[in-house]
């Protein structure tokens, strides 16, 4: 079991179909990396491979690497604090300080006693992120963390992820929203057909992303950018 997540020249087949082609990728501390590309590009597959959840992929230390799948919602009868405390399971302890820090970081400390099924979608997403933060990982792997959120909530989540990276963690997030990726990520990795087409600083990633999505390269991808 490796302590961190990394892929080195990985080719992966599932159900007889090659889903990753010679992929090399490693998260970097201090960076928010957005994985972008059209449906079926291999974004979630790459993320799950990093998390060691696919056959033949090394499983990183769960105390060091936290994975949040798309739409992660579990144990809805629990309170926010109880959900976040589940993040301590990999450490086999019930330490409360990391739980409190995670709720403060994610801006949900005031909701600690609220049931997760009775708060907004954005607040519930923050509770799932806080559960991952409570693990105190070095690497955060997030599949579509802004999916189904309204624009303001999506920007809030991306700001939080960028701050988290700039505080020294490695953060990797799958995103269909090119505008959010370009505005908040430090790097954008563009995938298509299970291959990495480009790995670029965010402010240089639009042409490659446009190619992958079949967009017109000069199109404005970000009509609703908000201040960071």
Predicted regions and their residues:
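The feature captures the beta-strand-to-loop junction immediately N-terminal to the Walker
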Residues: 36-38
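Helix-to-loop junction immediately C-terminal to a conserved catalytic motif
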Residues: 51
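Conserved ABC ATPase "signature" region
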Residues: 96-111
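Conserved ABC ATPase signature
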Residues: 115-119, 123
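ABC ATPase C-loop
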Residues: 132-133
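Catalytic Walker B motif of ABC-type/P-loop ATPase nucleotide-binding domains
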Residues: 140-143
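H-loop/switch region of ABC-family ATPase nucleotide-binding domains
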Residues: 175-176
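ABC ATPase nucleotide-binding domains
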Residues: 210-228
């Amino acid at each position: 079991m490796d302590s961190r997540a990394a892929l080195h020249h990985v080719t992966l087949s599932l159900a007889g179909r090659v889903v990753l082609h010679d992929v090399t990728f490693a998260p970097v501390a201090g960076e928010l990396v957005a994985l972008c590309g059209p449906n079926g590009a291999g974004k979630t597959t790459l993320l799950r491979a990093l998390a060691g959840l696919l056959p033949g992929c090394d499983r990183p230390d769960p105390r060091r690497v936290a994975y949040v799948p798309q739409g992660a919602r579990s144990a809805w009868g629990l309170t926010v604090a109880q959900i976040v405390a589940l993040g301590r399971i990999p450490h086999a302890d019930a330490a409360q300080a990391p739980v409190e820090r995670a709720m403060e970081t994610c801006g949900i400390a005031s909701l600690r006693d609220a049931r997760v099924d009775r708060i907004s979608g954005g607040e519930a997403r923050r509770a799932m992120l806080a559960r991952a933060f409570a693990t105190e990982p070095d690497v955060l792997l997030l599949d579509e963390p802004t999916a189904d959120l309204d624009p303001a909530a999506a920007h809030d989540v991306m700001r939080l992820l960028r701050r988290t990276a700039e505080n020294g963690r490695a953060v990797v997030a799958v995103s269909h929203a090119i505008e959010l990726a370009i505005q908040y990520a430090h790097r954008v990795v563009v995938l298509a057909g299970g291959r990495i087409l480009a790995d670029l600083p965010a402010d240089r990633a639009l042409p490659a992303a446009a190619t992958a999505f079949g967009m017109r390269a000069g199109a404005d991808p970000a009509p609703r950018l908000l201040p960071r």
